[in-house]
Amino acid sequence: LLVRPGSLAKVDGLRELWGANRRQVVAVEGDLSEPRLGVKAAWIRQHAGKIDHFFHLAAIYDMQASAESQRKSNVEGTRQALVLAKALKTGCFHQVSSIAAAGLYEGTFTEDMFEEAGALDHPYFQTKHESEGIVRAEKRLKWRIYRPGMVVGHSVTGEMDKVDGPYYFFETLRSLSKVVPEGLPLLMNKAGLLNIVPVD
């Protein structure tokens, strides 16, 4: 588990949450903005060929973040994650992207689609699309890309570590329920469907 030096203390809490020990979840100091994610060469040599699956989930998904910070994390971070995965001779690189890579595409954007993306005017859309392109162009490493829509809390407990995205919409719905009579049907159109995925 790649961890910034300032976040090492959080790993114990994650181990406890996952029911794992220190051998099962190993904290590796690194930094998304550094070459090979800042992982020490000695660690890479020691673990080369021993890692079957490399999961890259790190990104900035704050729609208000600057274009520069999104590019640094989402594009360059992905590029360096691939460099590290190749140095480790990883079996398969897994990228958790976002449906934002589709831009403002109208309709259903399937797993096989990429070039068909709609307008990529927002830095988040642009950087998620570009980072996927970097992975898709990779020839030396097997890879898989996952595009969740809006990620919400656990499907059973509702637990979530960050309130953003759809949670603001849920608050609006709660407010609306106080003024709209119970049982009153609301007109909705098909374009209003949302892809919401529980974190688990």
Model-derived regions, located:
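Short-chain dehydrogenase/reductase
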Residues: R71-V75, L120-E132, V163, G192-I196
